[in-house]
Structures are given as structure tokens and as C-alpha cells.
Amino acid sequence: MPWLQVRLAISPEQAETYEDALLEVGAVSVTFMDAEDQPIFEPDLNTTPLWSHTHLLALFEADTQPEAVFAHLQLLTGHDLPEHQAEVIEDQDWERSWMDNFQPMRFGQRLWIVPSWHEAPEKDAVNLLLDPGLAFGTGTHPTTALCLEWLDGQQLEGTQVLDFGCGSGILAIAALLLGAREAVGTDIDVQALEASRDNAQRNGIADDLFALYLPEHMPAMQADVLVANILAGPLVSLAPQLSGLVRPGGLLALSGILAEQGEEVAAAYAADFELDPIVVRDGWVRISGRRR
């Protein structure tokens, strides 16, 4: 059966207001979509991932009049509507259509991220199986891509890798598949640790090779390699702690940092690390270096 699809171009601040209003006027489903190809690999768990430019899609029964929907939305919100449109769409196999949007992606020279329903493009490559979901977006978010490419470029054989703020575990799992001896992941959210364990098992990684801890339970350690794809504020405030978690001569890679925040974060680590040039991509940066 056909459906009426209504699309609104909104900001994150408008999301809740328009979601509630659409449901009140009879939408049978409401979906948030990225308007500018800014997929999120590792959003905060228990949150709805929103982008700086978001499309809100709502489906209505086919006989719904779009003019009536827009009039009611304006009345309910008390504001002029943002950019909007309506169209009639035909029913389809939504699950298959959704799956077709996700293709294997390559990071660096060896590493691929491969959805479970796809054949690995290169059988002899390092293939990390990860299905789309909250921990996997429609493309390559610059921060996660920068970290994955950095890991791909390191000699990780025999190393211990710490993934600080592990989220889905994607960085630690990639490090293990690239040759790390063992990995440690830590996150403030128990659900993130559970997701990391599930993803590790899907990739054939034994539990004893990938230890997972809440921060307060993490043992004292100094890793050979530390990766942290979190936010600039915590990276600055935690700089003494993170620096102490890397052994002398060990490696560090940080992301989740906007370009304008790069110098501030780098300055917080400059005393303890010989830093590489900052790498910038699409307004995000990666900071890496070697412990003095």
C-alpha cells in the first residue's frame, strides 16, 4: 500500500517538538535521518543520534491530506514551519532496502568493515564484521575513520591496546584483528561494554583477549597503544590520567575533536608526547604521538 511521507528539515533543538507534533497529528512512524552524510559510529547509548542538519521523516496513511498536516503542525508548534515537503511513496521491502544502503568500507591498506550479509571484498584482508545500528552509520564518520586508518598504519603485533571510551568496541576489535596481543576496553556505560563483548565474539575474539571494565574497575596498567575517540573536553581534563596509561615509548591516538579544538587538546599532551602533525578531515582532527 502507498504512504504519505512528510519530510521536515530541522535542527537538533527542534527534534522533540516536531516529533511530538507529528505523532499527535497521526503519523504512524517518525524517523530521524542525517541530512548531510554525517553518520555516527559511536553515539552515546540511550540517546537518539542527531546531526547538525537533520531530516525528520513521518509516514501517514495514504489518504492523509498534507496541507492539513502542515496546518496542524504550525498550530501545535506556534511557529512557521521549517523547510518541508510531502510525497506519496509506494510500499516496498523496507528491510531489504535498508540493508542495500550498507556496503563494506575500507580503512587504510588492510582493514575492512563488513556487514554480516555481505561477502568480504578481499578474503585475505583484515575483515571486521559489524552490522549497522547505533554503533555504525551510513558512511565513514571522520573521527572513527581517522582512528581506524591510524590503527591500520601501525605495527600492532604483540602489543597491548587500550580503547578508552570503547563504545561498540570497534577500535579495540580492529586492533586485535590487526595483530594486537590483547586489548582492554573501558566505558562509563554498561551497555557499551555489552555491545563491545557481542561484537568481539562475532569476530571470533576470545573473551580473555579483550578485557572490558567500567572506569572505576579498571586495573592499573600502562598500555603499548591507547586510542580514545571521545570529546575534546574530557580529553583535555583527563590528559594526566590518559598520559599515565601509556608506557614510555608507547603510542597515542585521539579523536572526537573539532578542528578548532585541536590545538587546545594537543597542548594538553605536548609535555608527555612527541606529537605528530595534526590530521584534519571534514572539520574533525586526529592527534597522535609517542610517549616520551
From Swiss-Prot:
GO terms for biological process: methylation. GO terms for molecular function: protein-lysine N-methyltransferase activity. Gene3D superfamilies: Vaccinia Virus protein VP39. It holds the Pfam family PrmA. GO terms for cellular component: cytosol. Coiled coil: none annotated. S-adenosyl-L-methionine binds at T144, G165, D187, N229. It comes from the Bacteria. It catalyses: L-lysyl-[protein] + 3 S-adenosyl-L-methionine = N(6),N(6),N(6)-trimethyl-L-lysyl-[protein] + 3 S-adenosyl-L-homocysteine + 3 H(+). Transmembrane segments: none annotated. SUPFAM superfamilies: S-adenosyl-L-methionine-dependent methyltransferases (SSF53335). Its main location: cytoplasm. Methylates ribosomal protein L11. Belongs to the methyltransferase superfamily. PrmA family. PANTHER family: ELECTRON TRANSFER FLAVOPROTEIN BETA SUBUNIT LYSINE METHYLTRANSFERASE. This is Ribosomal protein L11 methyltransferase. It comes from Pseudomonas entomophila (strain L48).
